[in-house]
Amino acid sequence: MLRAITTTIIGVILGMMAMMAMHYLSMVFYPLPEAVTMEGAEALNKYMEIAPLVAMLLVIVSHAMGSFIGALVATLLSEREEWKNSTAFKYQCLFTGLLFTYTSWYNLENLIQPDWFKIDLLFYLPATYLGYKLVAKRA
C-alpha cells in the first residue's frame, strides 16, 4: 500500500514536470507576447482569447502527455506482483488521471479559455490508461 502511494506521488510529480516541459517547449514555436507571463492570470486570460489554434492544441497534447507519463512512471516503479494482488494498485493510475483531470477542470474554471477547449478534459483518463497498459502488458 505504501509503495502504491509513493509511486503514485512520484508519477504525478514527474507527469506534471513533463507537462510543464512540453508547455515551455511549445512556447519555442508559439512564444507568449512580452507583456504576458505564466504567473499573471489577467494577462494570460487576454492572451488565451487570441492564442493561435495550434498553440492551444499543443497545450492539450502537453496535458495528455503529462497524464500519460505520470501513469507510465507510477506503473514502472511499482512491483509487478502488485498488479495481480493489490487493490490499491488497481486505482493508482486512475487516481493519477483523475488528479490531472481535476486540475485541468480547475484551470478551466479560473482562466478564460475558448469553450471548445473543454475537450481537454476528455484526454486525461485515456492517456493515463495508455501509459498504464504500455507497461502492464509487459508483466
Predicted regions and their residues:
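Juxtamembrane/disordered regions of integral membrane proteins
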Residues: M1-A139
